[in-house]
């Protein structure tokens, strides 16, 4: 991992559990999905970097994984930190790539912000506007909460769903976050993400961390993996006794979050977790998956 990336995921770990000591007791083994398909009832996939990437790119073997699970009647879920649209739209995007998740089978980090806005309204301090950094489609998500994107929100609330800020927008966000009682909403907590060509790039979680550091903002709320809210929503969508496996490409979100949630995890190596850095990163974060999933 990049140094800042590792520090971000360590921060996440410490926010979840300052006494984190477990996570290395498992000895992961390399498996193919068909070897463990009978060991779990529900299979939860990360989206970008695990099943697909930008445009119509689909990773080799991903459709075969999905088809196998559908043919066996397994529960499937898309559990994604993509926060630039509603769950219905994210499900439709996945279906267009060959993964026919329904909206009910989709659990996204952005949807969890609904609780923040509801709580603010219940306290008599409704948030109707935010300074928004993200893709244009993200306004659809905000609208589903009854919230507008504004250059000059009445309250100093900044929401980040993707790393799309230019220098002027970044400076404006820092200025807002330096105001009293400012809040930073990190709708997508991914720090780095893989590209189709095999390289990796900083994304929304990295941008949000720089905003936090540069502004000194103390009230920072994180949505999505690895935090418990998204896994609580996932579990609530499944039978109580379901045996659950989280499949993803990121050690610091998919695997660490699954471990904290008490469910199984399988890591796809070499996309968002460089193979050569895997052992060092596992030791640094104090977590390993149950499996390394081979294609």
Regions found by a protein language model. Name each.
Residues 1-47, 53-56, 60-74, 83-104, ...:
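Asp-based, Mg2+/Mn2+-dependent phosphohydrolase catalytic module
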